Amino acid sequence: MTSNNSNQPITYPIFTVRWLSVHALGVPSVFFLGAIAAMQFIQR
C-alpha cells in the first residue's frame, strides 16, 4: 500500500478478479446472515 505502481503490471487496476471475488462472496454472505438473523425473530 506504500507505492501503487511498483510491483503491479502496466494497466492492471485492483478493480479485477480480487475485487470480484471479495464482493461476490462478501455481499451475499452479509445478505444471508441478515436474512437468517431476521428469521430468528419471526418464529410464529
UniProtKB/Swiss-Prot annotation:
It comes from the Bacteria. With its partner (PsbE) binds heme. PSII binds additional chlorophylls, carotenoids and specific lipids. The chain crosses the membrane at residues 19-35. GO terms for molecular function: electron transfer activity; heme binding; iron ion binding. Keywords: Electron transport, Heme, Iron, Membrane, Metal-binding, Photosynthesis, Photosystem II, Thylakoid, Transmembrane, Transmembrane helix, Transport. SUPFAM superfamilies: Cytochrome b559 subunits. Heme binds at residue 23. PROSITE patterns: CYTOCHROME_B559. Its cofactor is heme b. InterPro entries: PSII_cyt_b559_bsu, PSII_cyt_b559_CS, PSII_cyt_b559_N. It is found in: Cellular thylakoid membrane. Its main location: membrane. One of its GO terms (biological process) is photosynthetic electron transport chain. Heterodimer of an alpha subunit and a beta subunit. PSII is composed of 1 copy each of membrane proteins PsbA, PsbB, PsbC, PsbD, PsbE, PsbF, PsbH, PsbI, PsbJ, PsbK, PsbL, PsbM, PsbT, PsbX, PsbY, PsbZ, Psb30/Ycf12, peripheral proteins PsbO, CyanoQ (PsbQ), PsbU, PsbV and a large number of cofactors. It forms dimeric complexes. This b-type cytochrome is tightly associated with the reaction center of photosystem II (PSII). PSII is a light-driven water:plastoquinone oxidoreductase that uses light energy to abstract electrons from H(2)O, generating O(2) and a proton gradient subsequently used for ATP formation. It consists of a core antenna complex that captures photons, and an electron transfer chain that converts photonic excitation into a charge separation. Belongs to the PsbE/PsbF family. This is Cytochrome b559 subunit beta. It comes from Synechococcus elongatus (strain ATCC 33912 / PCC 7942 / FACHB-805) (Anacystis nidulans R2).
